[in-house]
Amino acid sequence: MPNPKPRTTHPQITAGLRQFATQQKLTPNTVYSQFFREVFLAELMDTDPVWVLKGGTNLYCLIPGARHTQDLDLYRQTSPTSHRDAADALISAMHRMQVGPYTFEVRNPRKESVSGTIENIQLTVIVRFGTTEFSRFNIDVSGDLEAPTVTESLAVTRTDPLKVPFARQHFTVLSYPIENQLADKTCAMYEIHGTRGSTRYRDLYDIGLIALELEVDAEKLRTALEQQSRIRALTLPPRLVLPSDEWPAGYKKFVGTLHQPRPELRTVESALTTAEALLNSVLSLDNPITVGRWSPEQRQWSPQPKSPGPST
């Protein structure tokens, strides 16, 4: 295989991304957005390496080929950690950051929200080529999360194969613990806003995907579930169930929007069965698993191996 030719100019880069979009059966705008989000993320982690990646992009970094998301979800794990101050710190670090022929403008339209007691603020990033806006994406900045301190970096490879001298093909991120992400998604499935139940079909899909692909620590997951249910003031069911009668039709419609969904998760019944295998033993009130590791290959919990005792 010949080495890909370097692409340094805007026309060269966009031509390469369009070609990649055609190969992947994606729209050019989807690939443009993914490229610039990853370039931005690599620069942020290099400039201000105290940010932790969560949400769909975190899952995509852990499981290449996971569903695409259209924004970044981030939080700071060192001061300032409140959502407003953290957002200001991100703007200070990245506003008007130049990378190759592109400039990132980070704006704060003050779109704030609350999930339980977790406050978020949404920033908008505009990617300019010269003075022209070429792409844009959003960043959701969360404040004051209860989560373990992340110390180990996760190696990430940029999604596209282009050789772009100013855009790192490989970079590292701090990744939100998968047990906490599972707890967030489980609780979000049962959170009620107003009078309507949850319609977060993507969370069931993602829980199933985690069950198929990643190891999970039982003790850390139980701790995270207890924290999130307390923060959101909700009581989780003793086993995973569909939140409402809307879910079979709603989930089917959601899966229809995905690019190459996993065959094991195409129906709500198969997704629920896969997610149940991971979560029911932890949610159980009668005999919950408290120690062990989830094996995605075996799709079951295994006892945690004991540490070897002192040699005699």
Language model region names:
Residues 1-51, 60-70, 76-312:
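Structured mid-to-C-terminal alpha-helical surface segments
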